[in-house]
Amino acid sequence: MCVFCVGAHVRAAINTAGAELTCRRAINGRARGGQTDHLSGSMVLLAALLPLVAAAALPASAAASGSLKDVKHVVFFMQENRAFDHYFGTMAGVRGFGDPNVHISKNTNKPMWHQPVDDSLEGPKPPSHVKELYPWYLNHQGGDWKDRTQCMIAGSNDWIANHAAWNHGQYDRWVRNNTPYSIGYYRREDLPLHFKLAESFLVGDAYHESVISSTDPNRITWLTGTINTNTSEVGGHPRKLGGPVIDNTRSPGCSKTDVGAPMTCNPKRWKTVPEYLMEAGITFQFYQDHDNFGCDPLVQFQQYKDAAKKKEELARRGTSYPGLEKFYQDAHEGKLPEVSYVVPPTDLSEHPPYTPRDGAWLQRKVAHAVMHGKAWNNTVYILSYDETGGWADHVMSPHAPRDEPGEWMLDPYNHTFGQAPTGPGFRLPFYIISPWTRNGGVFTEPTSHESQIMFLEEWAKAHGKPFHSKEMNPWRRKHMSNLLNALDFSKYDTSVPDLPHVPTATKDPVTHRYNGATVCQKKFDKHVQPEVPYGKQNLTDALRVEKGFKPMRGNPTEGRYLTFESGKYALSHKGNKVSAGKKSSKRDEHDQLFVLHWLGGNPRDLRFRIATPGKQMGKAGKYITQKLGLSSNAKDAAVFEITFENGGYSVVDTQSHKHLALDNGKVSLKGDCSSFSLYSVTI
């Protein structure tokens, strides 16, 4: 037997034993009120592995599975102002326009895709007979509109407009309280580089802005874990420490809410993640040109101002301008620090009207530098966006209870609205590029900017350099993902995809600054806002998505058709009964598709009903019962806890604590452990 095959054999044994350990821990935990017996579980795993490892008779390096300790470099790159639906709503295998759990507005009694319109909205007015607008393809007019809309704008990204669009959880004011352009979207042909990177590695379809507002609140959370609202972990009066950061105001002093309370006070003085990195002995560097679009918010903190005056290391690493060319060079030579932050120039940031195409050119250069650099085999590169930029998305994260510290505040612009959530907000494009996420599928855990901090904390701990960002709100730390489930350390693939060509971003010949948006708007005489298709839509065309699937990673969320697969079989509802059928490689058999209906109150609550697809969007079909039958009555439905560990999913009936299983083509609930692979499917 070849070394590779034996290594794979042992890895498979490790995964199998690990899955069994996970199940036994789960069973023990339920029996003991949530307290797991880690010692006995470890002995089970050891007993399962020793004979297999001995039989393999290989060096440890051949059999060992990877770990977070194998990651030597982490690269963060945050772009600007794009929403998930706006970019990836049509993508196959993600929670997009094909969402079977789409929210039904209590105001309209329709899925939120039906956005009410009237003549009070900003932008082009609808004809009097048109009462609603669906999401619409921005380049529906054809011709050169694929170039024109590159430099168009949507609407407002501020607190007021985005809370209005949310509308207390009804999501039905995107057009009325922003603009009809807000619900426009691109397709694959408009974003070939973005799609290629996301699908060649791991795309996240549950990554949320941390604050339902603009750039500074979100970028500051990305680097500190907080905006310092009242009762937050930072504490102290805003006039002393700064915050609460509600908008992009950067001038000294404080703005005021409509009742006169201080907000967005400057300078800010609470502790930042880079300071924790320095204390832990972790090297880091912000790579940015002098033109950085103001996207390095560390300059707003007094400690960085003081460090710059004294020419100290904190300022050299956090607020200086080594340039993006320095990043490309360091990546190529394998000289990147342990943690790198990439900050975009204005015209390459993708912030409307700055073009996705120019942003793609920068993304391609950064990805190429990382993937072709000498440290690619031990690097994790995380690409995210700060906030939605006035573009619509149809999913917002569950919010914390109102008594959670730092999570709610009296609406700063209209106190009559009462308490408002600070976040997490709508979803953003997000992908992780690394040898442990190659062809990784879709990551479904609720995630936000705080998640990147928590990933760094876990990574630092694995390297013996622990730190803890105490400024982060406790609810975010408890309920947002730390991204560890996104990486599959049982698979290691350093192959590099062929990336599509992207035209070189243009520069002004005099100033040498990038000027793509200016060139675009001048070429088309600023006629870049497409016609709003009032009265010309049908819902099927508006919500057309790519047919396909992606393997899932991470704890599950709603919003997708699923196949439950085990071995050669898939769960089925053929013949109006729960059964098992031979799985389809295309995952397009309707009777093998199911939909989850979430019963939880917070993101870590993983209780679901499992149903067949409904005949209407947002409605369930028939539910799986505890006796493994099907019922149209939700009261008859079994409640399952579905969790992800060791690369598979356990599906446990919460009443009997038995595992849903497919054994030799038969469906059962059994006491022994069973694991499924889940695929997210669009049809």
Language-model features: where?
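Fungal secretory targeting signals
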Residues: 42-59
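Basic polycationic patches enriched in arginine
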Residues: 11, 24-25, 30-32
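N-terminal pro-sequences and low-complexity stem/linker regions of secreted or lumenal proteins
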Residues: 60-657, 662-683
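Short linear segments in intrinsically disordered or otherwise low-structure-confidence regions
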Residues: 7-8, 12-14, 21
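Context-dependent free N-terminus signature
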Residues: 2, 29, 44-45
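Intrinsic-disorder-associated, low-complexity terminal segments enriched in Asp/Asn/His/Tyr and depleted
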Residues: 15, 37-38
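Cysteine-centered motifs
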Residues: 2-5, 23
